[in-house]
Structure formats: structure tokens, C-alpha cells
Amino acid sequence: MYKSFSMELAGRTLTVDIGRVCAQANGAALIKYGETTVLSTVVASDKPRDGVDFFPLSVEFEEKMYAVGKIPGGFNKREGKASENAILTSRVIDRPMRPLFPKDYRNDVTLNNMVMSVDPECRPEVVGMIGSALVTTMSDIPFDGPCAMTQMGMVDGEFIVNPSQKVWDKGDLQLTVASTRTKVIMIEAGANEIPEEKMIEAIYKCHDVNQTIIQFMDKIVAECGKPKHEYTSCAIPDEMFAAMKEIVTPEDMENAVFTDEKQKREENIREITDKLAEAFADKEEWLAVLGEAVYQYQKKTVRKMILKDHKRPDGRAINQIRPLAAEVDLIPRVHGSAMFTRGQTQICDVVTLAPLSEVQKIDGLDANITTKRYIHQYNFPAYSVGETKVSRGPGRREIGHGALAEKALVAVLPSEEEFPYAIRAVSETFESNGSTSMASTCASCMALMAAGVPIKSMVAGISCGLVTGDTDDDYIVLTDIQGLEDFFGDMDFKVTGTHKGITAIQMDIKIHGLTRPIVEEAIARTREARFYIMDEVMSKAISKPRKEVGAYAPKIIQIQIDPNKIGDVVGQKGKTINEIIARTDVKIDITDEGAVSVCGTDKEKMAEAIDMIKTITTDFEEGQIFTGTVVSIKEFGAFIEFAPGKEGMVHISKISKERINRVEDVLTLGDKVTVVCLGKDKMGRISFSMKDVPENN
């Protein structure tokens, strides 16, 4: 039976239709927020997937171009692969949902959010997030919901709940928070150096709004929810763990994992696995899950070491950062490069500068964003973790890590007017043992400074982890988690920022939420750590941006012209501007406001191009001096081209102070001559004189 539910949310109406569409899905809802419409569905397989030791959850966020009245580009005129925004939104939805499914659930689950219309006042990402949580909670799929999500913007210091697309894009804060009834379960933020106290305030304002959404969901689930279905547990049998502990004691496992060298630890675990496989040779059902069982045994051992003994696997103190190193100019000839090393995590970042014509073009649902000037890309090759694998391009993880490090630096980048370049930073993972995205932030910051990009402040990033006990008060926050602590811990809380404030946050967890004291402690720990990284490591490699771009980087000169004269510079079908480019070997960009950027590597050629543009756009007042080329000779005079596409005439009587009978007696085609402007005639044509040029010219 079709039912409709509504609530007021941040000054707009949120409407949920249940039973109207997609009856064959486990859960479905057509959701409208303002006039933004998203179809959210969830489907689970009947049986668990064989041979997997993880929960196979897939989250999709489909951006349909008809939602904004567009026909997709390309030959087929249909949507292709997911955009970067769609991938990032899918990841943000996945992170709070995944911890709320049973840990021993192995059925395939697909969450799909299809954007069908977009109201610029109501962002579709918010609707998809709410829809995913709602349809899963009301479905028959095992899920410990509900959870809810809210976005927060900030303009002039004032918070704005679920801001419009325009406010979200231009404001000082882009914060997304997911909550359960009592705890925060996910945080994603980009910020313009916001102080830690202000960020915490914003997080818990979102949390409060989430409680009203959860109450709304409770009403819907009470009327339309389905009983949860039974499922086959894939948990490791208790008797198997007992048998393992007789062969490999907890002390043996602790000794195996207690080393600061990742490769040694992995070798120790392989030996333990081989020993257990030999002992369980006659138990096929145990051999099938032995890898997962050893993983769980490691996990219990590491968590006990940290929580009860305050002993980390590599011997560090709870708040201690791994050994750090930083250097710049590692790679010759590139525009800027830097390498940042933290323990066994190592990132090399390379920056490339280009004219603004090379900005990334974006054709998405947000009409306010059509280009991206700063691009950060992250690569994670198999060799960085000692594996063999063919590279098949960036996956969702690589795109997500690249976007986080990009978000971290956006707040400190110079404006286009201050620095008229497109900027690409590429982080190459040389070695990985946790927090490569935070190392990418540090490396890209240094590479930008080495490239001569005048960033406003230095930015660093660090991640905190968490191990929890049986109660909310029983926990330990870890500074700078390595890979093992990430895998076996409960939290990965990444924060980037300057000395002034936070520029980005990404928090994802494996438990059912964090209390406020944990959130506050994690943010305080990351602040202390990033100050140390900037002051004691990064600033000793490079303390401020270089005053000029590198020798191999293109140079850019900017001038302003009258917008009404842009057509004169461009010429008919681009003839004039193309001739300037051909003569001087430069690139020229002109905005609608008349800002002209000339880009090249030869300063003399660039100056020549600037002179041509200035000449073309001059008002040709009487007395101006020009140098030009004779391009045509007539009986009555000669035509002088003084700039591409610009000609004036010297009458025969104005060629020489002495009387001449023929123009050819003095001038030939191709001659370079200096002329003085006499003004324009009634037809608007420019008149020149050679004989009246002042002697000092």
C-alpha cells in the first residue's frame, strides 16, 4: 500500500513515498526534498557469497543528466561511468552504513541512489544519504539502524543547515555528519581554516539535526518496516579458536606482531598460518576459513596489547609519531617535487603548472561548478605494499584519497588573479603502511611551495586511531596509526590543517559511533601532531613558497583590456589571436571580463605578444608611435601592418620630407618602418605619417 510521509527540514519539506515504486526491491523509497528527487533502493542476495572474508556491500550514486535538463555528451548520448562527485558521494554513504550491518553477514547488498531531479536549493547528496539509511532500516535486511546524515555550511561565521548548492560551493565549511541515536558515526569536511572549537560545534549541531530525522524515520519504519530475515552466520567457530590457541599461544601471536617492520610481521604470520594449516590438515571446513581465523586472532591480540597493556605493535608510545623525513626537488626538470616519509609510508608528490585554458572541465549536476583549477591525484601501485598486480587505473579508494588531499589544500591556494595557473599535483605512493592520504597532504603542500605556488599557509595532516573496550569510557586514542592499527582498530580519524585551523576531516569507523569525548580528543591530538610535523619537519625542508616558478615551468603575464575590444584581439574566426600565437609561440587566454593571460617560456616573446595586444586595443590617438611592416603598396600610398590584423595607411605625401613621385622609390614590401599616428579619418581608418616621426624615434 502506498504511503507518503513528510517533515520540515531546514526550512524545506522532505517527503518520502513508500510502496509507490520498486516493489521487488528489499527496500525502496521515492524521496523529495524541495524539488530534488532521488530514488533510493536496497537489495540483498538470498545466500552469502562463497569464499569471501568481508561484507560485499556496494553503494551507487547515479547522476542522471535529465535531472538538470541536459543531454549527456559523447556519441551514445547516455550516462557513462560514474563522475568523481558520484564516487565520493557513494563513499560517504558507505562509511556510516557499513558498521551497522552484522559483522558475520556475507550476503551481497547493493544500495542504489538515482538522482532524478535537482533543485539547486536542495543538494541531492543529502537526499541520497537519508534515503539509503531509511530504505535499509525499513527493509528485511539485517541492519542496526537507523542513522541519519546532515550537511552544514558556514557563511560569515553563521552555520547553515543543509545549505543550497551555491552556499555549499562558496562557503567556508562543507561538513557532512552521520549519527545514530546517541553517537556520531561518520564525519567528512572541507573547511577554510576553521578553529577546532568551531568545527566541534558544527559537528554536534549536525548531530542534533540528525536526531529529528531519526525520529521521522522511526515513524516510517513503525508503519512500513519489514521483519528482518534470518541469515547464515559466517563467524569463525569457537572450537576452532580454542584449537588454534593450543597450537599458537597468545604469547606466540603477540611476539609475531610486535615489530616495527611490516615485512617481518607478515613473515611471522605466514609461518603461523603454515603451522596451523599443517595441524588442521584433516579439517577441510577449518582450512577454508583459516585465513580469516588467523586475521581475527591477530586482531584480538593487537587490541588487547593496546587497550590493556598500552603497548603498540611497533613499540611506540600512544601519542608518538613514527620517524619523519621531508625533502624537496627530488625530481629534476619537473615544476615542483617533494617527498614525505612517515615510518614505512612514503609519498613523492610532483606539481605541474599550466595556463588556465588547461583547467579540468566538469559536466555534472552542479551548475555552479564547470571547471576545476586545482587537481590532486593519488596513485597506489602494488609495489608500494610489496605485491604483484597489474595496474588498471585508479579505483574508488585512489579517487577518494586524492580528493581528501585536494580538499586539504584548497583553502590555502592563491586566487586566479594572484596566480593565473592551472595546477596539478600527483602523489605517487612509494611505500605504504597506513595514512598515505595524510602523507600525500604533506608532500603536496611542500611540492606546491617548491613549484613557486604562493599558498597562504603550510598544511599538514595526521590520522588518529581508536581501540575500545566494553564501555564508552574504556578506550584509547592512538596518534599516527600504522596499517595494522587501522585494520584491527575501530577508527581512522584524519585531520588536515594549518596553524590557524582545520582544512579537512575524514572520519570512518568500524563500531556503532563515537562519543563526544573521543571526537574532541582525536581532534586535539591531530592538532598537536600536525603542528609538530609542520614546525619540526616540513618547514626545515622548505619554509615558504619560492618567489618564482621553476625554470621549466611556463611563465604567465596578465594584463587587463577593455572587454569591448576582445573581438579585436581575437579577430575574425580567430585569425588575429592565432597569428599572435604563431609569431610568438605563446598561449593566450582571455576572460569575458577582459583579463588576458599570456603564457610561455621565452620572456622576450611573451613581451612581444603583450605589446601586440596592447597595440591592437589602443585607442589610436594622434601622436602615438608604432613600428610596422609594409604589407601593400598603392599609387597613393602604403599600408602598414603594425599588429596582427591591424593596418593603417601612409599617404604618399607623408612618406618623406622630400617630394617623391612613386611610393616604390622609398618603400618595398616587407620593409620595417616607424610611423606616427595622425588619427582616424571619417571612415574610421587609421592614418600614419613617416616624415613627422620625431627625430628621437
Which positions does each model-derived feature cover?
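Extended amphipathic alpha-helical scaffolds
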Residues: 1-45, 49, 53, 230-369, ...
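Long, basic N-terminal domains or extensions that often function
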Residues: 1-232
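Glycine-rich, flexible beta-strand/loop modules in the N-terminal catalytic cores of phosphate-handling
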Residues: 25-109, 115-117, 122, 188, ...
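Conserved phosphate/anionic-ligand binding catalytic regions in large, soluble enzymes, centered on
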Residues: 27-29, 122-141, 328-351, 433-453, ...
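Flexible glycine-/small-residue-rich
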Residues: 33, 42-44, 61-63, 113-117, ...
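Flexible, glycine/charged-enriched surface loops at secondary-structure junctions
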Residues: 103-109, 144-146, 213-231, 263, ...
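Single-stranded RNA-binding regions, centering on S1/OB-family and related RNA-binding modules
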Residues: 290, 552-556, 563-697
